[in-house]
């Protein structure tokens, strides 16, 4: 179920505060975050945000097409190794 339009989108306060400070100073630094549930807002455009995927932080450059998506959508947590070949040993 989608979030109510009466409410504002969820953005972690510490991330938003860091981005606003960087926008005021006009700096471009990598912002490290564990908040995968945060929604990308227009203030984040042009910044690089390192999102945690459970093992490491993946740097993601935010563009205008990413607005209203969540940060976790761009940092996959599972690594697909591929299907097993026809292995005669594993079958009975």
UniProtKB/Swiss-Prot annotation:
One of its GO terms (biological process) is ribosomal small subunit assembly. It comes from the Eukaryota. The keyword Protein transport does not apply. It is found in: Plastid, Chloroplast. One of its GO terms (cellular component) is chloroplast. Keywords: Chloroplast, Plastid, Ribonucleoprotein, Ribosomal protein, RNA-binding, rRNA-binding. The keyword Metal-binding does not apply. GO terms for molecular function: rRNA binding; structural constituent of ribosome. Protein S19 forms a complex with S13 that binds strongly to the 16S ribosomal RNA. Belongs to the universal ribosomal protein uS19 family. This is Small ribosomal subunit protein uS19c. It comes from Pinus thunbergii (Japanese black pine). The gene is rps19.
